[in-house]
Amino acid sequence: MSFAFKTGRVSIRTIRRMNTRSSSRCPFHADAAGAAPALHPPGAWPPGPRAGLTGWRLLRAMSRDLLGTLAGWQRAHGDVVHLRMWPEHAVVVTDPALVRELLVAQHDALVRWERGIRVFSQVHGHSVLIAEGHAWRDKRHAMQPNFMPKPVQAFVPSIAATAGHALAQWPAHDAHWPIESALTSLAMDVIMRTMFSDAIGANARVAEAAVRTISAAANAEFYQPANAPDWMPWKRGKARALAVLNGLIDRQLHARLDVPEHGWPDDLLSRLLRLHRADPRTWPLQAVHDECMTAFLAGHETVAATLTWWAWNMAAHPAAQAAARDEVVRVLGGRAPTADTRAALRYLTQTLEETMRMYPAAPILISRRASRPVALGAWQFPARTLFMLPIQLMHHDARWFPEPAAFRPERFGDDAPAIPRGAYLPFGTGPRVCLGQHLAMTEMTVAAAMILQRHALSVPPGMAPPRASLNVTLRPERALHLAIAPTSPAANAAAS
């Protein structure tokens, strides 16, 4: 439910070499004498790669492999890296304390990167994802009640029923099951039922294809100085995909309006439509449409991407899969997950948390523009500095996560060493923290538990580990297929 800054192919191998030396050491880390470092004078910039005349070669490098390129610059120059890309001064920040300082303590000095907002607004309109200032606060206040922990607990029976219906369509055996597509359909159906009280049904495959097309178009547009009109011949696919998604949302909206208000279900769509009827100037139907689009796209994509990588981790690590399944069988005792039992699935939750460390759905947060001068650590940055926040580099940093390439769910156990604040941010932090994080964690835990009740996951013979690709969210470069088989009789009894 967060979104990335830019896109490109991800070199996980490059990121895994990240036993980083920091030449721009965080001033919040006290030295031996406990003395704070001196501030650099205004106008001084942190170290960074040579930019050449325009710095556009840096942009080209990022367009080829964004995360791998940023990881290399971090190794060479430290946790605060200056990129001079005319006309921009961009600063890449990968120190947890400084990232948290920006997103929490200095959030009011930052606005979201204009180019990213222009690209996303083509799909999301002027929703809470796009808005700033008072408009953002009003929209978030309107949306938040549906995503608080207590309302989310009430969704658990619906989530479990939806997951059960979806999993009933899976075959008992398949040596090459398209698990990524199946999990995406499941996530779409859950968000449709919880937010709009309807099923995705036959629209799932068409909607999935449309989302992929829109994501690919966004990838290209992040690196272009301006957007060509959608009626240009090479953008017809994007226009058709937008029409599919807009039609999906508009059908929900108008079907609800055709029903008397006293018959409306208690869901997000009804809440937004009541705001429209109470104040149509502030909440025109287009505003309702925009919020519904963001709820659908952000609401399913983070879950689908994370469950896809979780399924890979389970298949690639049979011992962890067996431990998680044993816990599911012990805790649920033949029942479907409930709000009460979900909290007891601690090891299963750790497998999801470790998956989000290794493969955060949004590995780079939307960049922030300083609206005024910002003092950050030892540096004093002028207004209009652009801050890039690649959280995946922190998630793969051996200083915070020893052996970062290893899948180790015990990192998140109760007895594990504390993770530095700001080092683990799968949902972001600060006032802009992901609105749907409670719903996402609940949905993923319920779905994962029910998968393990029914299916054993394994890697097909000869299959290489999937390569990650950043298309707004982090997905396998090629659609993930895994082998599935029925679980043991004890686990099957739990699923019945």
Show the residue positions of the predicted features.
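Cytochrome P450 I-helix active-site segment
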Residues: 47-52, 156, 160, 209-213, ...
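Cytochrome P450 proximal C-terminal region
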Residues: 4, 14-37, 74, 163, ...
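Intrinsically disordered, low-complexity segments enriched in small polar residues
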Residues: 2, 8-11
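N-terminal membrane-proximal hinge/A-helix region immediately C-terminal to the signal-anchor transmembrane segment
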Residues: 16-138, 153, 157-165, 201-202, ...
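Cytochrome P450 catalytic-core helices
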Residues: 302-321, 325-327, 438-453
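Cytochrome P450 heme-thiolate "Cys pocket" and heme-binding signature region
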Residues: 138, 293, 298, 336-340, ...
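Cytochrome P450 heme-thiolate monooxygenase catalytic core
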Residues: 19-21, 25-46, 112-120, 135, ...
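Conserved cytochrome P450 K-helix/beta-meander segment immediately N-terminal to the heme-binding cysteine loop
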Residues: 373, 389-416
